[in-house]
Design a protein with these regions (language model features):
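N-terminal FAD cofactor-binding segment of flavoenzymes
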Residues: 26, 30-84, 103
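Short FAD-binding loop at a beta-strand-to-alpha-helix junction that anchors the flavin cofactor
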Residues: 210, 215-216, 272-290
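C-terminal helical "tail/cap" subdomain of flavin- and related membrane-associated enzymes
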Residues: 303-412
Length: 412
């Protein structure tokens, strides 16, 4: 719904959630599950501020109460080294789930429509600021009317205009095609998480990514970890090479495409913007720095916020622990300096680490003992050198990339 109230009229509720992406809708869904919290979600109207359809992925034992939004899932993952050798791992009891943003939005909007005290406002959030007893969100609808929303707490998932100061910033940037082949070319039981059989850039690393949906349909992506994104033409050329010469798909058609950029950074993302204003999602640090994954952390964070509010507290827990962030900072710096070989590093992790332990590590839920054992299987010398120098490096402010996170606030 869109508001038609005048600019001075305030609409009051318990919580306002700014942004209708993965983070905003997940939080609204968790908050309204019991019906005792009045929630208003502010979503941008149709236009340039509304993101295109995206793909989000995460692993879990089951799809929880989001099963209706899951398009496909896999319990076997594969990584291809630069030498062409494949490593296939069984992830049971975990499964790798794929969610399309339109399916997720439809599911949550349906549930919000049934929840007492929940509503969705189609408007642009122009300003968010603290007031006595809470916070206000000043909005403007597409047809001109303005609305002031007042709440005890505001959770803002909008992208930051600039990234917080960081020592290292790489971009995970990609373009993907949803393809349909003339003949059966895919194994729907196995997802290719990283395929390093693509030409490697001079700086950083590149890999292919395949999520098979049927024997003749899949999402195939070309991804780089590097300092700068590519032109659309360059992604198209790389995808054409990957589909034609690496995957050997034969004749195929491209039914849809998606493209994104995710910051991979050791910046510290503040989760509080004021006494009653909190940041969630990527803006609140929910994107894992070394992988770009966001969706699982968003679900954990949303559940924790909802539980705290029902107990009378307003908190946004850290999406990842200090150990995970410290390890990510070392890895990002080692990749950026070229001290470690990216394809060799990730291929080695999958080759030498039990899959359940590795997935817990990638999701930030591993134990110190598991992390120690994984660390011993990495290039110890370059990683130690990087760990020693990190505390002495300055943090610099950089502009935020123009497209949101992969399978998190945008794909992956």
């Amino acid at each position: 719904m869109s508001s038609t109230r005048g600019p001075r009229e305030a609409d009051e509720c318990d919580v306002v959630v700014v942004g209708g992406g993965a983070a905003g809708l997940s939080l609204a869904h968790r908050l309204t599950a019991t019906g005792d919290i009045a929630v208003t979600v502010v979503e941008p109207p149709d236009g340039p501020l509304r993101p295109p359809e995206r793909t989000w992925c995460y692993w879990d034992r089951d799809a929880d109460d989001l099963a209706e939004a899951v398009s496909a899932s896999w319990s076997r993952l594969r990584v291809h080294g630069t030498d062409g050798r494949a490593i296939t791992v069984e992830t049971a009891p975990l499964r790798y789930h794929m969610v399309r943003s339109t399916h997720f939005e439809r599911l949550v909007h349906t549930r919000l429509a049934r929840a007492p005290g929940a509503r969705v406002v189609r408007a642009t959030a122009d300003a968010v600021h603290d007031v006595h007893g809470g916070a206000e969100v000043h909005c403007s609808a597409a047809d001109g009317p303005r609305l002031v929303l007042r709440a005890r707490h505001v959770f803002d998932s909008r992208p930051l205009p600039a990234l917080p100061p960081a020592r290292t910033l790489l971009l995970q940037h990609f373009r993907g095609w949803f393809v349909r082949t003339a003949a059966a070319r895919f194994d729907p039981a196995v997802a290719d998480l990283m395929d390093f059989r693509v030409p490697q850039p001079r700086h950083g690393l590149a890999f292919g990514y395949v999520l098979p949906l049927a024997p003749d349909r899949a999402l195939i992506e070309y991804t780089e970890f590097s300092r700068t994104a590519l032109s659309t033409a360059a992604y198209e050329a790389a995808l054409g090479h990957y589909g034609r010469d690496v995957l050997r798909l034969g004749a195929f058609t491209v039914e849809a495409a998606e493209q994104g950029v995710i910051p991979m950074t050791d910046a510290r993302f503040p989760r509080r913007a004021g006494p009653a204003v909190f940041r969630i999602g990527t803006a609140g640090g929910a994107t894992r720095p070394a992988t770009g994954y966001t969706f699982a952390a968003v679900q954990r964070q949303s559940r924790a916020i909802a539980a705290a509010l029902r107990d009378g507290h307003a908190v946004v827990p850290a999406p990842y622990g200090r150990r995970a962030l410290a390890m990510d900072a070392v890895l990002l710096r080692a990749l950026d300096t070229g001290r470690i070989d990216g394809p060799g590093f990730f291929t080695g992790l999958f080759r030498r680490t039990p899959p359940q332990r590795l997935l817990r590590f990638l999701d930030g839920e591993s134990t110190p003992w598991e992390e120690w054992r994984i660390g011993l299987r990495t290039p110890v010398g370059p990683m130690l050198r990087t760990a020693v120098e990190l505390p002495f490096l300055p943090r610099r402010t950089r502009p935020a990339p123009g497209t949101g996170p992969r399978h998190g606030e945008s794909p992956r």
